[in-house]
Amino acid sequence: MSNNQTLFERAQRIIPGGVNSPVRAFRSVGGTPRFVARAQGAYFWDADGKRYIDYIGSWGPMIVGHVHPDVLAAVQRVLADGFSFGAPTEAEIEIAEEICKLVPSIEQVRMVSSGTEATMSALRLARGFTGRSRIVKFEGCYHGHADSLLVKAGSGLLTFGNPTSAGVPADVAKHTTVLEYNNVAALEEAFAAFGGEIAAVIVEPVAGNMNLVRGTPEFLNALRALTAKHGAVLIFDEVMCGFRVALGGAQQHYGITPDLTCLGKVIGGGMPAAAFGGRGDIMSHLAPLGGVYQAGTLSGNPVAVAAGLATLRLIQAPGFHDALADKTRRLADGLAAEARAAGVPFSADAIGGMFGLYFTEQVPASFADVTKSDIERFNRFFHLMLDTGVYFAPSAYEAGFVSSAHDDATLDATLDAARRAFAALRA
């Protein structure tokens, strides 16, 4: 029995499912999860000592690679002065100033510890600001595991939303309306029907939890126009795509200014950190200034802030995002070319440092499109690549991530492995 198997069996005795986040359990693809022993640059080593090229990067935060020397040094510098204070620090101001500089739509920002906290708090703030209850989200977009966001569409546009998780009360879910991503007509119909009830629309401008699906400019511009017209708050959830699609996030890429933005992953540099921010007149409704309550013991944790600040400074290097996008595009195009040469139905997309792999002929534009992917073939591909030391997301519904540490050698090795994997899929 491998060390990975031994650890997984041990974990399952004391941790539900053996993992602390469901996708890590390999339930979608089968097999034994890899338990990470250490990581460096574009690689990690599992409990059996095998090395993998890592295209998850902790699900997005490791944009400069694992254990970057500048990030490590920043963390080491602050450790001797204390791990957590529950009181303000100058470093909190510095990271807030950095975020506001890089994302101009954010006039004020509040630090939290997770993406779920960021989206949950932003929605509460939007409700407090507008005095309304209804929120609109989109099928396939994931915004964390708060009750009001674990909701699926009802049987028709105007029906109440239905919970997607046990433990979510129907009375909570009914305040959430779920629409199809990139469907402008459905959006217009919803605002015509109950626009005056909508507190906020929350959207991933580049979705990463139904694999990679880009918002179309038409769709995102319609969101901006309709929310402004009806007095609703437009929230961009850039926890995943923030600082990855462009230095200023997806909102810079598309040229669209939201009212509030949720950030995470990259801003913690691999440490637990997230944030939400936006217009000053909205943010002023937060306690202690206003009546919308939000708090957190570890918010603005000095160790997390140090890692985040170091990462944000590294990604401002001239040409950083152009180089990252070029690498990611080379990977996506190379995989598509290898599949095409093998005669395997497949498509791929990339934007910034994010990419998507789909076992379908066309790049998806909605969750319904993603579900047409050949899941069985994806699972086989995943294991073929894993066996050769390439670690993609263990789910057909997750995006992948490239870092600045991925060099030509790692990309070449990945494409060589893919050539053999696609040939095996065809056989």
Curated annotation (Swiss-Prot):
GO molecular function, one term: transaminase activity
Cofactor entry: pyridoxal 5'-phosphate
Leader peptide range in chain numbering: none
GO BP annotation list: protoporphyrinogen IX biosynthetic process
A Pfam family of this chain: Aminotran_3
UniProt pathway annotation: Porphyrin-containing compound metabolism; protoporphyrin-IX biosynthesis; 5-aminolevulinate from L-glutamyl-tRNA(Glu): step 2/2
Annotated catalysed reactions: (S)-4-amino-5-oxopentanoate = 5-aminolevulinate
GO cellular component, one term: cytoplasm
Enzyme Commission number(s): 5.4.3.8
Keyword Isomerase found: yes
Annotated localization: Cytoplasm
Sequence positions bearing N6-(pyridoxal phosphate)lysine: K265
Keywords: Cytoplasm, Isomerase, Porphyrin biosynthesis, Pyridoxal phosphate
Family: Belongs to the class-III pyridoxal-phosphate-dependent aminotransferase family. HemL subfamily.
Subunit structure: Homodimer.
Matches recorded under HAMAP family: HemL_aminotrans_3
Protein name as it appears in the record: Glutamate-1-semialdehyde 2,1-aminomutase
Organism for this UniProt entry: Burkholderia pseudomallei (strain 1106a)
Gene: hemL
